[in-house]
């Protein structure tokens, strides 16, 4: 890793807890996703939650649209070790039911669950059971009067909607909440979050909503979330993709890793390849990414196909390989080793070295 250290001054915010996961304050930025199974299919939903846990999800959101889904949530919660957020709209009784079943956070907008007495019932329940709330504002579902006032979604419209819901919780003396102001347009979302960051002290959940498929959505999220994170804004994040939710977690950690905010697993530094490559760099990287998905200890590994940039990258990596004729140079902790790798077996050899180094320095294979 380069000795250059970026300076990111984190926005000050209050700290809340989603289950056992701290959010805001000086807590690590949490990465979360959302199940896309039918919640009433308990087996499928639990299986997806387990898959998300394996790739490092800190928090997982589950849609609970009906009382039938609430009953399924009870069974799902029993089989989950990661904190679960129940996504609820309109029916306050569902919020009360999942609270009874041990939900770790409620994703509701207080203003859309009806009369003041219903809002108070949910908030009082959240107070009694120490359950935080996430206010989730979306550019596609702003209140009618705000739509009419602004004509179209604007940063100011998203802010006004958010503050309207915040005011309800303030009036009920409830401060254990976080807020999101999502939009599918990067600049709209970024500016809305900037305004919100100045207006309240609560933690902010970041997201570019409906970002798109795996490739386009990852790029859009990286740009938008990266802008905010580099400014110190954000306490949790979700990369919203029309893809397997597991990919959301992987991309989320990749974004944090690229900004050196939080690292998980191997950071591969690999060249795009050209005719100088002495071994199959692309195939090597792809194979190692799959083989080493179980690794959560942060580590920089450079895989460069020739001697032009290879030695320089290897000097600032934990492990490095520099392409050579039939055999490639191997670097450990920035120092060239006498040992060389046979290019034909470079994947097996490099995997063994990575696992040996991790076993020596971090037997518990931990996440930062």
UniProtKB/Swiss-Prot annotation:
One GO term of the biological process aspect: isopentenyl diphosphate biosynthetic process, methylerythritol 4-phosphate pathway
This protein's pathway: Isoprenoid biosynthesis; isopentenyl diphosphate biosynthesis via DXP pathway; isopentenyl diphosphate from 1-deoxy-D-xylulose 5-phosphate: step 5/6
Cofactor remark from the record: Binds 1 [4Fe-4S] cluster.
Residues noted as binding [4Fe-4S] cluster in the record, renumbered to the chain: 271, 274, 306, 313
EC number, UniProt record: 1.17.7.3
Keywords of the record: 4Fe-4S, Iron, Iron-sulfur, Isoprene biosynthesis, Metal-binding, Oxidoreductase
Catalytic activity: (2E)-4-hydroxy-3-methylbut-2-enyl diphosphate + oxidized [flavodoxin] + H2O + 2 H(+) = 2-C-methyl-D-erythritol 2,4-cyclic diphosphate + reduced [flavodoxin]
Pfam families: GcpE
UniProt keyword 4Fe-4S, yes or no: yes
Single annotated GO MF: 4-hydroxy-3-methylbut-2-enyl-diphosphate synthase activity (flavodoxin)
Cofactor requirements of the protein: [4Fe-4S] cluster
NCBIfam families reported in the protein's UniProt record: ispG_gcpE, PRK00366.1
Family statement: Belongs to the IspG family.
Database matches in PANTHER family: 4-HYDROXY-3-METHYLBUT-2-EN-1-YL DIPHOSPHATE SYNTHASE (PTHR30454), 4-HYDROXY-3-METHYLBUT-2-EN-1-YL DIPHOSPHATE SYNTHASE (FERREDOXIN), CHLOROPLASTIC (PTHR30454:SF0)
HAMAP family documented for this protein: IspG
The protein's role, per its UniProt record: Converts 2C-methyl-D-erythritol 2,4-cyclodiphosphate (ME-2,4cPP) into 1-hydroxy-2-methyl-2-(E)-butenyl 4-diphosphate.
Protein's UniProt name: 4-hydroxy-3-methylbut-2-en-1-yl diphosphate synthase (flavodoxin)
Species this protein is from: Mannheimia succiniciproducens (strain KCTC 0769BP / MBEL55E)
This protein's encoding gene: ispG
């Amino acid at each position: 890793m380069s000795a250059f250290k970026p300076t990111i001054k984190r926005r000050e915010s209050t700290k809340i807890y989603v289950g056992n996961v701290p959010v805001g304050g000086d807590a690590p930025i949490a990465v979360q996703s959302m199940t896309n199974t039918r919640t009433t299919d308990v087996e499928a939903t639990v299986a997806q939650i387990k898959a998300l846990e394996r790739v490092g999800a800190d928090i997982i959101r589950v849609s609970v649209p009906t009382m039938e889904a609430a009953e399924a949530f009870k069974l799902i919660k029993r089989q989950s070790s990661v904190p679960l957020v129940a996504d609820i709209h309109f029916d306050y009784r569902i919020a009360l039911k999942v609270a009874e079943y041990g939900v770790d956070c409620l994703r509701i907008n207080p203003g859309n669950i009806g009369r003041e007495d219903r809002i108070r019932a949910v908030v009082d329940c959240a107070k009694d059971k120490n359950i935080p709330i996430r206010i989730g504002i979306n550019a596609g579902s702003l209140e009618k009067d705000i739509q009419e006032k602004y004509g179209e979604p604007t940063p100011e419209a998203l802010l006004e909607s958010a503050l309207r819901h915040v005011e309800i919780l303030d009036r009920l003396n409830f401060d254990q909440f976080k807020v999101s102001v999502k939009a599918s347009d990067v600049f709209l979302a970024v500016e809305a979050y900037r305004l919100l960051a100045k207006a309240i002290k609560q933690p902010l959940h970041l997201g570019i909503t409906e970002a798109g498929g795996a490739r386009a959505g990852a790029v859009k999220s990286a740009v938008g979330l990266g802008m905010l994170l580099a400014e110190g804004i954000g306490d949790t994040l979700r990369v919203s993709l029309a893809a397997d939710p597991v990919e959301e977690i992987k991309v989320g950690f990749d974004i944090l890793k690229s900004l050196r905010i939080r690292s998980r697993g191997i950071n591969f530094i690999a060249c795009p390849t050209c005719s100088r490559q002495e071994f199959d760099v692309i195939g090597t990287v792809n194979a190692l990414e799959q083989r080493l998905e179980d690794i959560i200890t942060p580590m920089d590994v450079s895989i460069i196909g020739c001697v032009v940039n290879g030695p320089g990258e290897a000097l600032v990596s934990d492990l490095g390989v520099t392409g050579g004729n039939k055999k490639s140079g191997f670097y450990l902790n920035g120092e060239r080793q006498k040992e060389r790798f046979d290019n034909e077996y470079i994947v097996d050899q490099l995997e063994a070295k990575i696992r040996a180094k991790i076993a020596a320095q971090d037997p518990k294979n931990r996440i930062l």
